[in-house]
Amino acid sequence: MNRLEAERRFAQRMKETYPPGTRIVLLSMENDPRPIEDNTRGTVMTVDDIGTLHCDFDNGRSLGIVPGEDSFRRLTDEELAEEQDEDMDEDNAPVMGM
C-alpha cells in the first residue's frame, strides 16, 4: 500500500470513529501557538480528508485536532450521561423574572 492510500484509509477510519456530534475531551495540545486549554470538552463538527478533527469546544473556540500530535479521547458513556443530567438540571431550573 502506498502512502496516499494509507493516508486515505487513516482519514476514513477517523471519519468512522469520530462522526459529527461525537463528544471528545482534549487532553493536551502541544504545537499550537494558541492551544485550547487541557481537559476542554468539545464536539466534532467534521473530519477532513487528512483526518483532522474540526471541533467546536465548550469554551467557545473552534479548532482542528491533529491525531498523532494532539492528545484527545472520546467521552465515556458515563461522562455523556453526566452531561445529559447537567443539561436536564439546567432545563428544570426556575426562571427568574424582573
Report each predicted region and the residues it spans.
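Basic/aromatic-rich interaction segments and small domains that mediate binding to polyanionic partners
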Residues: 2-89
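Non-Sec secretion/translocation targeting segments of pathogen effectors
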Residues: 86-98
